[in-house]
């Protein structure tokens, strides 16, 4: 995702809207805030390598990690900023276990939507928000390009970070 943003910047391709799911929601939000590619790379390094967000193990009744580190790192990075105040339009998605539907986060506090979008079931605890139990958006829509096309006109570029089937080793 960061590589695609870097290539677009180098090629002078303007980006006027960003959407993301799971890890892509954090990268997209940082870009939509107007951060440079090097800053986004550094923040991701601070969160995922230096911050060790997945090292707060717990008895796996709900998940293998408590999720407090990641929760605090995302909240600290994005502060109390609102999605609707971002310089570039942004949304991210999470899976709503309460309504058994996709939840689109296009307004409200950034860190809450991003934290919900990256709550991988079993790995980390779900996000409880406004009476909803939210998990990683990839459970229902790992590539929200279709949602972007439904909402906005113009070209949509979607970045799928899942490996191609032909790249996996057969069993």
Language-model-detected regions and their locations in the chain:
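Patatin-like phospholipase
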Residues: 1-21, 29-171
């Amino acid at each position: 995702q960061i590589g695609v943003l870097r290539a677009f910047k180098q090629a002078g391709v303007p980006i006027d809207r960003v959407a993301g799911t799971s890890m892509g929601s954090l990268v997209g939000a940082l870009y939509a805030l107007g951060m440079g590619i090097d800053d986004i790379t550094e923040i991701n390094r601070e969160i995922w390598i230096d911050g060790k967000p997945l090292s707060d193990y717990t008895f796996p009744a709900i998940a293998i990690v408590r999720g407090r580190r990641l929760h605090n790192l995302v909240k600290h990075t994005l502060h109390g900023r609102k999605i609707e105040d971002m310089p570039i339009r942004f949304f991210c998605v999470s899976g709503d276990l309460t309504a058994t539907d996709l939840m689109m986060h296009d307004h409200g506090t950034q860190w809450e939507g991003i934290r919900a979008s990256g709550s991988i079931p079993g790995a980390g605890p779900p996000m409880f928000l406004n009476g909803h139990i939210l998990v990683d958006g990839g459970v229902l829509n790992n590539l929200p390009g279709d949602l972007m096309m439904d909402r906005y006109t113009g070209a949509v570029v979607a970045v799928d970070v899942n490996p191609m089937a032909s790249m996996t080793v057969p069993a």
